[in-house]
Structure formats: C-alpha cells, structure tokens
Design a protein with these regions (language model features):
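Short, Lys/Arg-enriched N-terminal segments with co-localized hydrophobic residues
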Residues: 10-11, 15-29
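Intrinsically disordered, low-complexity, compositionally biased regions/tails
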Residues: 8, 18-20, 103, 111
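Short loop/turn segments that flank or connect secondary-structure elements
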Residues: 29-222
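Cysteine-centered motifs
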Residues: 4-5, 16
C-alpha cells in the first residue's frame, strides 16, 4: 500500500483547490496533482528532442498510429482537405483507404499508417527529417488544430485509470539522442513539454506540477 510522504494544498484563483501529494513506500514513485498521478520520471529524467540525430523516428517507428481523443477525430477530418496536398502520395492513399482516423488492434482511435504498418499517414519528410503535415499547416495558419495531443506530449503517455490519469514517461530507444541532449542541457521532461502539458491540463495544473517538482527535489536534498 502507498503511504503519503508529505502533502500540500493551495487555493487558486476561482476557488479551485489543488492538492499535491507525494506517495511513497520506501522511495517515492509518483505525485498526485488533482486527478492526475505523475510519475517521478517526468520530474527527474531529462529530455530535449534532437531532430538532427533521431530524424523524427517517432513519427515512423511503432506498430500503431498516434493515439487520438474522440474530439480530435473531428478536428483531423476537417483539417484533411487543407493538408491533403502536403502529404506523401502514400499518405493520401492511406487516408482514402482507411479514413482520416482508424481503430487499432486494441480498439483505440489512432491515425492511419501508410501501408498499414509504416509511418503515420500525416508524416512528411523535409531534409530527411520526418515531421507532421498537420503541425506544419498549423504554423502556416492554414488550420487551427496543431497535431494530436498524444504526439505533442511525447515522450509522456497518458493512461486513463478509473479515477485518475496516469502521466508516465515512455522510454524508447529511438529517443536516446534526446535523452543525451536533455542531460547536457539539464532540461527535465516536464519542462521540455510545458506547452503540451498546459494544452492538456491547463496552466494552473502545470503551475502545481512545477511546485510539486520543486518540493520533491528539495526533499531529496534535505
């Protein structure tokens, strides 16, 4: 059973009370912030994408498309006509065959893959680096949807539990260069993914995560 190492709570603007708890048995393993359980790997591990080294392999490797929230399937369907001319011919063929989204073997909503087992259908290549056509169109002002939040959050993965979201750091060997660069620059995962985490959970939640991280790291020094 988990025991509470220490706890703190703060009253935020609008009357929302966020509780922060650090759980531990012999050593801490997670932070509870509101309805999320955040792995301490997200606080302690370092990460900065190094596209010159990895070439965007996370858009290519893997046996399933990018996980999607139901609302995102609507956004992508609306965006597709505006990004179609940016896609690889094989990407267009995949979308025309499988749809703008599909369901994988686990029953989850995902983006379609080229050939059913290659890169995401929305992947494009620029100077040998795999990037996202949706994100490129977003920055060009063509669409208002940036990219699936699961992609934006990577290397964080969200697991839906009964009463909580589990916020975990997903270690993948294709990201080894990002781990090295993160260590060199001393940037933890949660700071590298600040924008994505705010997109997912909001600025107040992120501020509480930052506070909890500072509290936890200070407790390790004491």
């Amino acid at each position: 059973s988990l025991s509470c190492c220490y706890s703190a709570s703060r009253q935020l603007a609008g009357g929302c009370l966020f509780s922060i708890r650090i759980f531990a048995e012999e050593t801490p393993t997670m932070l509870q912030i509101g309805k999320t359980l955040v792995s301490l790997d997200v606080i302690e591990s370092k990460f900065v994408c190094d596209l010159d080294k990895c070439k965007g392999e996370c858009c290519v490797a893997g046996d399933s498309g990018a996980p999607l929230e139901e609302s995102e399937t609507i956004e992508i369907a609306a965006a597709y006509p505006l990004v179609k001319d940016m896609l690889q011919p094989e990407g267009i063929e995949s979308v025309e065959t499988y749809g703008t989204h599909t369901i994988d073997s686990d029953g989850d909503l995902v983006t379609p893959l080229i050939g059913g087992n290659r890169e995401c259908a929305y992947t494009i290549f620029e100077n040998g680096i795999a990037t996202c056509a949706l994100e490129k169109a977003y920055f060009q002002g063509k669409i208002s949807f940036r990219k699936p939040v699961s992609c934006h959050l990577y290397p964080i993965r969200i697991q839906k539990l009964k009463n909580f979201d589990a916020v975990n750091y997903d270690r993948w060997d294709v990201c080894s260069a990002a781990c090295k660069l993160g260590e060199q620059l001393k940037v933890p995962v949660y700071k590298f993914l600040k924008d994505a985490l705010i997109r997912k959970y909001g600025p107040e939640w992120y501020n509480e995560l930052s506070l909890a991280a500072e509290m936890y790291l200070k407790s390790k020094e004491d």
